[in-house]
Regions:
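Catalytic cores and adjacent flexible loops of soluble metabolic enzymes
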Residues: 1-118
Length: 118
């Protein structure tokens, strides 16, 4: 079971995204919460949604955003979808797992800068 936080306008005005609802819905309903995006600039809203805990992103796709239709302007073309997935995967790596550790890449600096105080 997963709820989707959504705005019904096509395209959605960015200032109406109210992404802070994601953690609120997660806490209130004790379930996964995703984001259903209808904005014309996907990464401006989908990336912060992931950072706030969205566990899925729902987007409309089209082969051409200039085609006639209510949701074409708010849809992603294939290249836009590829970029969005790439960026979300990078953000997931950047956010990490929340466990503090010393990374292998830190060891040389640690050896160089660490001093023993007596």
């Amino acid at each position: 079971f997963e709820l989707l936080h959504c705005h019904s306008a096509y395209p959605m005005p960015l200032e109406e995204a109210n992404l802070n609802m994601i953690p609120i819905l997660k806490k209130k309903f004790r379930c996964k919460v995703g984001y259903s995006g209808h904005e014309s600039s996907a990464s401006n809203v989908c990336i912060p949604a992931v950072m706030l805990g969205a566990t899925s992103i729902e987007r409309h796709i089209t082969l051409n955003r200039t085609w006639y239709g209510d949701d074409q302007a708010a849809s992603l073309e294939p290249d836009g979808l590829k970029r969005l997935v790439r960026d979300i995967r990078l953000i997931e790596k950047i956010l990490g797992d929340g466990k503090k550790r010393v990374w292998r890449s830190e060891i040389p600096a640690q050896k160089k800068l660490r001093q023993i105080l007596t």
